[in-house]
Each structure stands twice: as C-alpha cells, then as structure tokens.
Amino acid sequence: MKIIIPNINDKVHYIEDKQSIVLLGANGAGKTRMSVWIDENNPELNIHRISAQKSLNMPEYVRPTELRRAEDNFLYGTTYNDRDWLKSAGKKYNRWGDEPEIHMLNDFQPLMEFLMTENFEKSIEYRENHKDGNQEFDNETKLEKIKKIWEKVITHRKLIVCAGKIEVESKEGNTEKYNGNMMSDGERAIFHYIAEVVSAKDKS
C-alpha cells in the first residue's frame, strides 16, 4: 500500500508498506485535518475514517435491506452507481455533511442495517447449502465476529443476535435480557469501534 501524504518542502512524499500509522500531536496540531487530507487525496485506496466526535445512539430495531445499498449507506452515507463519485464527493457530502473535519459522525443506524442485512443474507446462504447436503459449509457473519471480540473485552456480558436487534444478558444469568440500545456508554463505544473495523472493506 502506498499512501500520499502532504508535501514537505514542495516535494511529494509517500508512506509505503506500513500496517499501522500513528499521528501524534497536541490538541489543534492538525491530526484530524491530516487524516481528512489523506482520505481525499488517495482516491484509489479504501479509506474508512472513524471520527472521535460521534453519536453512540444504537437503534432499538433495524430492518434488513438490499446488501449493496446497506453497505453503501454505511460507508458513504448514500448509494449511487458512479462508484468514483460515491467514494469522493458522495462520501464527503453525505457521510461527513460537507464538513469532514468537524462533522459529528452519526452512522450507528446504517451500520446496524448493514450488519443485519449481511447476517440475513448469509443465513439464507447457510440454509440453502445445508439443505443441499453441504454440511461442511460455513460462512461466519460480521455480527458473529463482532460478538466474539466484544465478549472477550466485556467478559461478564454476552450478546444475543436476534432478528432486527441485538440483546445483552449477563453470563451468570442473574439479570434479564435487555435491548442493545440500553448498553452502557462504554459497552456501546466498544461495540461501535469493533463493528466499524470489522465492517470496513478489506485492505482499508
């Protein structure tokens, strides 16, 4: 992977073959603006940016929709046949409200719609393969991956994936199940970060 970064002394610079890049700087030093610059000036790359300013209002219920539409709405805030426009202007105006440096990200609804749609599609695929006798077939869903990771971090709770919603219960079984939108701020934040990373495109 080759990432263009802002010019230094009028010379073009790149970061190549790095799995992780960490930007360090004081408040107001320009870390967010640099990440926006990288996003807007590397159109050939799949870049998925998670804002520090975000809403953590998890929807109580969601409905599955068409898979590509659901993924587009999550990644770009809208859907359109022109993929180049979608990844550039479409994402800037819709996901980031034309203010990518300061806009408060509010994507929990489209994120959950994408996860539930993908879960629904793979459930159908799994059922059809097993009906045809392919008992070895498996197709782990993104929600299953998120559940595994989340439960390793939040060790006293477990997630239950239901039709159109997430429920939570104690692993000790001493509390009633409750809707995922009633999770604590920390539990929802952890779920959101895990889900964003798992749901980003491969090689983002």
Could you say what each language-model-derived stretch is?
Residues M1-I15:
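Pre-Walker A adenine-sensing motif
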Residues K2, P6, T79-R188, A195-K203:
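Extended helical coiled-coil dimerization/tether regions that scaffold
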Residues K11-K18, V197-K201:
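Phosphate-binding P-loop
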Residues L23:
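Hydrophobic anchor at the beta1->P-loop junction of P-loop NTPases
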Residues K31:
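Conserved lysine of the Walker
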Residues E44-N57:
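Conserved catalytic segments around the Walker B and adjacent sensor/switch elements
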